[in-house]
Curated annotation (Swiss-Prot):
Its EC number is 4.2.3.4. This is 3-dehydroquinate synthase. The keyword 4Fe-4S does not apply. The gene is aroB. Zn(2+) binds at E184, H247, H264. It is an enzyme of class 4 (lyase). NAD(+) binds at T129, T130, K142, K151. The keyword NAD applies. Its cofactor is Co(2+); Zn(2+); NAD(+). Binds 1 divalent metal cation per subunit. Can use either Co(2+) or Zn(2+).
Amino acid sequence: MRTIQVTTPGVQYPVYLGSGLLPQVASRLRKLTAPNSRIFIVTSPEIWALWGKKLLSGFGKSSPEVLFLPAGEAHKRMASVEKLATALSESGADRSSLLIAFGGGILGDLTGFLAAIYMRGIDYVQIPTTLLAQVDSSVGGKTGANLSTGKNLIGSFHHPRAVFADVDVLHTLPPRELRAGLQECVKAGIIRDAALFSYMERNAETILAADDAALTRVIAAAVRMKADVVQQDEREGGLRMILNYGHTLGHAIETVTHYRGLLHGEAVGWGMLAATELSRMRGLLTAAQSERMQRVILAYGPLPRFRAKAEALLEATARDKKNRAGTRRFVLAEKIGHATIVEDVTEAELRAVIAWLLQRVREAGQLREVGA
C-alpha cells in the first residue's frame, strides 16, 4: 500500500492507494471518529451489489447505515442533496457523524457537498470506485452539484478526512470507464508531469489492459501531482486552475449534450484535443508537440462523437467558472509537463478552435453519435 499525504494550510489527510483496502477501512475510521459516532455510507445500488460486502466485512456488528443514490449525472443536483440530508436527519445524524462516499466522482462530489452543508459541516471520507474519481475528484476538497445552466455551479471546498483508492474495484469497471479515467491521467502528464506522459505514451497497451502495477504507478503519479498543486493553491486562486486543462470545452460539451452519452473523461478528452490545438494556434506549442499530445490522448480513446452547434458551445464557455469580469480564461500547454493560464483568448480564437474541434468530431468514425 502507498500513502500520499495531501497538505494544505488548514488540513492534512492521507490518500491510501493499493489492493485489498476495502476491508481495512473500518479499522482506519476508528482512529478518525469519536466513540459511538454514527457512520453513513452513501453509494449506488450497483456499487453496493459489487463491493458492499467487502467494505462491511471490517465493521463487524456495528455496520453503518446505507443511503442509496442512483448513478448518473442527472442525479447530481440539489434535489438529491435535500433527499439525502432529510434521510440523515430522520436517522439522527449529528455533528459527530461521518459520511462515506462510496462510488464514482458524481457521487463523491455530491456526498462531499452534503457533508459540507449538513449541520454546517460534518466529516466524510472518499472511497472512489472509478479511475477518474481516484485520480481526480476524490482529492482536493472540491464538492458540488449541477444546475441546468452548467456543471458544478453550486459547491464548496470541503476536504475529506481520508481517501481509500483500492485498485481492486477497477477490475469491475467497463473498459470504456477505464479509458475515460485514463484521460485525466494523460491530462496530469500534459500539465505537470512529463515523465508520467512519457510512461503513458510508451505503455498504453499494458495500462489499457488494467495491469495492476501499471495502473498503480499511473494513479500514484496523478495523485501526487494533484496533491502538490492543491498544497500550493487550495482555493483555485491561480496555479490550481491548470487542473482544468481540457475542461473549458469539456464542460461545455457536457452542458450542450445535457450530460447524456458522453462520460466526463471522454468530454475532457475532446476538450484536451481542442486546448492542445489552441495552444498550437497561439504559438505556445510546435506542430510536432501538438501532434504528439493528440496522439496520446487518442491512444486512450476512442472518443464518442457528439452533435453540437458551435454557437451553443461558445455560449456554454461563457459560463465557465474560471472566467472573470467577462474575460474567458483558458488553460493551455506550453510544453509537455507545463501548462499556463491565458486570460486574453479572443472570441475569434475560440470560434476557430470550436470549428476545428467539430470538424474532428465529424471525421471520427468511432462508436456512435450522442447528444442533440
